[in-house]
Amino acid sequence: MAGTGLFAEILDGEVYKYYADGEWKTSSSGKSVAIMNPATRKTQYKVQACTQEEVNAVMELAKSAQKSWAKTPLWKRAELLHKAAAILKDNKAPMAESLVKEIAKPAKDSVTEVVRSGDLISYCAEEGVRILGEGKFLLSDSFPGNDRTKYCLTSKIPLGVVLAIPPFNYPVNLAVSKIAPALIAGNSLVLKPPTQGAVSCLHMVHCFHLAGFPKGLISCITGKGSEIGDFLTMHPAVNCISFTGGDTGISISKKAGMIPLQMELGGKDACIVLDDADLDLVASNIIKGGFSYSGQRCTAVKVVLVMESVADELVEKVKAKVAKLTVGPPEENSDITAVVSESSANFIEGLVMDAKEKGATFCQEYKREGNLIWPLLLDNVRPDMRIAWEEPFGPVVPVLRINSVEEGINHCNASNFGLQGCVFTKDINKAILISDAMETGTVQINSAPARGPDHFPFQGLKDSGIGSQGVTNSINLMTKVKTTVINLPTPSYSMG
Ligand SMILES: NC(=O)C1=CN([C@@H]2O[C@H](COP(=O)(O)OP(=O)(O)OC[C@H]3O[C@@H](n4cnc5c(N)ncnc54)[C@H](OP(=O)(O)O)[C@@H]3O)[C@@H](O)[C@H]2O)C=CC1
Ligand SMILES: O=C(O)[C@H](O)COP(=O)(O)O
């Protein structure tokens, strides 16, 4: 059970502690932040509301711990990461349990998230020892006007303190996707978990604690982003911010100083369906892509752009599959569970009502109880409806009928977002041309958008982000290139 056994020390009465200087602590604020269970809409957990002084203390510790961590051999950093991964996987139950309770993720998917996170940490350790163990050697005489008098050696050095801010929907996985690359690269790490998802993150951090990382190297500050977010992101000790979430990321980017930013933000992933597509395959992918975790994925299918000639048939197939989705508690592995908050449910409802007023075809009756919204397919959506452009982050999928492929591409490219997209056709040549024309970070051919596997590059164009994720890209982003040039008194060439 969460907060018991191996994890008992992370709890103080009914409030979870924060983590600093290698210890679990109670905030001097005397205040806590409530975490609501999205399904019951009752307070499930409480976490510390950390103060600015506590943030300052953590940053000082992170700065000094990083100096000695950077001198720790790569293989030792990797060894500790492997240890943390093993502890995490061995103790998946309390983390999965808290994911169910604080973000209403179905029980099976919650376990998958923790296991995937352990695998990500291990992969990162292995990738890190390889790519950070290599550098470059350049010779001066390849540039015009130079003899071979200079040997240039390059290597990758850490940035310093990395601030990691993940979102609610994959709190554990999107936290470790920032923590593991930061640590293997020799950085220290300050984590600000999402409020919904904080308890799962605190358990995950305890796994790193149990693995024996040096004191101060990893910290976890809890509190509402709206209250301590600016103080954290504008803190002078921070040398890199890795953020995943919504528009907040855009304002952080504007306020952050001259530091590397990794921003994975919202998306309006389009699914373009050509008239030669395998419609059974498309229908299954719309269900998986649009309704998994009740549509609360940045990579969810958020608009279907289907050729008019096959639209009726596709809509019928999707409708039949929607009817089979189960709706209910996450504990019972229901396909559709309560969305994360009442404000989120209200926002989704706003999009649905706007589509209703403007004449969209409802393939199912709209139904909502508390934060639980029944899966809904909206046909005949038009560009004047909000749902054609905004991301619901809920179990609602709009279908726009198109008369040409160009119309589909234009709709996709007119979005402010550019995260992922997908195209369904049996003609691979057409698929490649469409993929090249879509202004998104990734295009999936004949499958729904997805971030995983976690070592693939993952990035958004336009308002969907800055930089690229994926294990290798994250390690690279969290390092800087350092060069040393050896100057010879006379040119030297190897002979023979
Ligand atoms: N591209 C991608 O990889 C992904 C994108 N997303 C996007 O994220 C959104 C949903 O996630 P959600 O968690 O609601 O996103 P938010 O942007 O609301 O929150 C993300 C994180 O930022 C924190 N935060 C809030 N305000 C501030 C602030 N002023 N300064 C610093 N941090 C702050 C939050 O903390 P707190 O919870 O305490 O408010 C949370 O940890 C969707 O738009 C979705 O598309 C989601 C997942 C992946
Ligand atoms: O937050 C998200 O939506 C995730 O980054 C998506 O991950 P997935 O595509 O692997 O589910």
Curated annotation (Swiss-Prot):
NADP(+) binds at residues 192, 195, 230, 391. Substrate binds at residues 116, 169-170, 297-299, 451. CDD domains: ALDH_F11_NP-GAPDH. The active site is at residues 264, 298. It comes from the Eukaryota. It is found in: Cytoplasm. The modification Phosphothreonine is found at residue 4. NAD(+) binds at residues 245-249. The keyword Chaperone does not apply. GO terms for cellular component: cytoplasm. Its EC number is 1.2.1.9. It catalyses: D-glyceraldehyde 3-phosphate + NADP(+) + H2O = (2R)-3-phosphoglycerate + NADPH + 2 H(+). The modification N-acetylalanine is found at residue 2. PROSITE patterns: ALDEHYDE_DEHYDR_CYS (PS00070), ALDEHYDE_DEHYDR_GLU (PS00687). Pfam families: Aldedh. The record marks 169 as: Transition state stabilizer. Gene3D superfamilies: Aldehyde Dehydrogenase, Chain A, domain 1 (3.40.605.10), Aldehyde Dehydrogenase, Chain A, domain 2 (3.40.309.10). One of its GO terms (molecular function) is glyceraldehyde-3-phosphate dehydrogenase (NADP+) (non-phosphorylating) activity. Belongs to the aldehyde dehydrogenase family. Important as a means of generating NADPH for biosynthetic reactions. This is NADP-dependent glyceraldehyde-3-phosphate dehydrogenase. It comes from Arabidopsis thaliana (Mouse-ear cress). The lineage of its organism: Eukaryota, Viridiplantae, Streptophyta, Embryophyta, Tracheophyta.
